[in-house]
Amino acid sequence: MPITVNKLRHDTHHFFYKKIGAIFFISIFATFMNILIDMFIKPDMHIVSIMENNKFINASSLLEFIQNMNLNEKHELLKYSILKIMESLISKTTLLGSIIILISVVSEPKKKSIVSSIRTFFLFFPSLFILNFLTTFIIQIGFMLLIIPGILLSIILSLSPIILFFKKNRLLDSIRLSMYISWKYIKIIGPGVLFWMCGKFILTMLLAHFSLINKNVLFLISNISMNILFSILIIYLFRFYMIFLRS
């Protein structure tokens, strides 16, 4: 079966509207999990206010800001940064794992029970979390060097969670296979990832102009919208990999 962008776009559109309720629920659940973890973190409010009130133009301004901190403030900033990274990874892994399980359950001819699906999710979660950590770290290094390497790494690593789920491979094998397949089909996978990135950018720009809306409400809308956008990307990539396995 030939793989085309139009075919994948049509299948993604069809699946999204067919399971729109479940996708919205998962997106909202992941957002509230994010909020719940944020409540438990309880950071030093002095550090949070400093971070929110300072606009860092580049890495040097951030480094200068950190150098002017005392030892206790540096410790609190490090702790806060690590906890926020963990929060983001847990939320992303929950969303990613849930959407992958949802698509696999719908795609299988033999329907699985809810208990079986939840069990599969919890078995899949630890390895997916580690994979997310590795790929996020690699992609961020790419963005630190230049924007183009970051975008390219985002594209070629995008299939790794789906390969991990399908093949039950080791983490590094999933990354390696993702790089090989994504590079080979970059003209098909690239548009999906770029659409997601552009969607995130446009959404961020639009929501930045809604200054009259309550900050917490804006955070909620932003997170749910971002989660839905990411879910669409996962559906697109999952469908690609299903067709790829059959071809």
Curated annotation (Swiss-Prot):
Q: Which InterPro entries match?
A: UPF0259
- What's one GO-annotated cellular component? plasma membrane
How this chain sits in the membrane, per its record, is:
Multi-pass membrane protein
Q: Is this entry keyworded Cell cycle?
A: no
Alphabetically sorted, this entry's keywords are:
Cell membrane, Membrane, Transmembrane, Transmembrane helix
Main localization, broad class: membrane
Q: Which Pfam families match?
A: UPF0259 (PF06790)
Subcellular localization: Cell membrane
Question: Does the keyword Magnesium feature in the UniProt annotation?
Answer: no
* Annotated family: Belongs to the UPF0259 family.
For this entry, the protein name equals UPF0259 membrane protein BUAP5A_271
Question: Origin organism of this chain?
Answer: Buchnera aphidicola subsp. Acyrthosiphon pisum (strain 5A)
